[in-house]
Design a protein with these regions (language model features):
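Short, highly charged C-terminal tails/helix-capping segments
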Residues: 224-242
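N-terminal segment of the mature soluble domain
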Residues: 55-142
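A short, compositionally biased domain-edge/stem linker segment
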Residues: 38-50
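Bacterial Sec signal peptide processing site at the extreme N-terminus
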Residues: 16-37
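A generic local secondary-structure boundary/capping motif
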Residues: 48-51, 161-163
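Sec-dependent bacterial lipoprotein signal peptides
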Residues: 1-18
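Surface-exposed short loop/turn segments
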Residues: 113-179
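Short secondary-structure boundary motifs at beta->alpha junctions and helix caps
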Residues: 157-170, 176-222
Length: 242
């Protein structure tokens, strides 16, 4: 009787806890990242205050961490070693093209994510000419689909693909010179992923990790394309020395 009661509560929670898609609260994600998602990054130009480092230069990549409580509409993005390696690999074409001399991860636990000046100072201590500040936030939309009607059966609870977990990761990249006030427009990208299965086995964290991987790929591609463009549009070295 006790087992039957436990199974009844399990089935009820599975069928009623996430019945309808709620979508993503992108406004909350943008607030955490301090960005305006409606801005058109392609039409914005880098700051003319100071000069962009002369190529090839050393780039330090700083992965920011935020402390906020996880809930359905907002998830903290954890930057793993694999994530850092993926981004560095994605930026490798800039080294092949002699725009960058070196790319490395800037690790400094004393620096706060929102303090760009402190991050630039840390970059200078480690020999960087510019720093790329990477930030991110995630969200999960978990809901039932048409197969959820099978959940009241014991077999259906474990086998019916009645639950979907949509994941969104919004990532930003902000490029700053270390020894001048030059900085580029913040780049905003998104990665999405979906997991489908029984409510017992659908893993929200796996969907979020997959979306993060997509976001990192999009961000590295965006930075490569934009930095190539910014270098072409920057004044020649003779003008920068005047």
């Amino acid at each position: 009787m006790q087992l039957f009661t436990m199974m009844t509560w399990l089935i009820l929670s599975l069928t009623t806890g996430c019945a309808v898609s709620q979508g993503f609260n992108q406004a909350a994600m943008s607030d955490v990242l301090h960005v305006d998602p409606t801005s058109d990054q392609d039409t914005r130009t880098p700051s003319h205050e100071g000069s962009i480092p002369s190529p090839p230069f050393r780039l330090g990549v700083f992965f920011a961490n935020h402390d906020f409580p996880n809930h359905q509409s907002l998830r903290k993005v954890e930057w793993l070693s694999a994530d850092r390696e993926q981004l560095l690999h994605g930026l490798a074409p800039l080294r092949d093209q002699q725009i960058l001399a070196d790319i490395f991860v800037l690790m400094d636990s004393t620096v706060q994510a929102a303090n760009s000046d402190a991050i630039r100072q840390a970059g200078a201590r480690y020999g960087a000419d510019a720093v790329l500040i990477v930030d991110g936030a995630g969200a999960i939309d978990r809901y039932n689909n048409r197969y959820a009607w099978l959940y009241p059966t014991l077999v259906g609870t474990y086998l019916a693909p009645g639950t979907e977990s949509d994941a969104l990761v919004m990532a930003t990249g902000s490029l700053w010179a270390v020894r001048s006030e030059w900085h580029a427009p913040i780049q905003i990208v998104e990665g999405v992923s979906k997991a489908v299965g029984s409510a017992v086995f659908v893993d929200d964290s796996a969907a979020l990790q997959s979306a993060k991987k997509q976001a990192i790929q999009a961000l590295s591609t965006r930075i490569v394309d934009q930095l190539q463009l910014w270098m072409q549009e920057s004044p020649p070295p003779r003008s920068r020395l005047q």
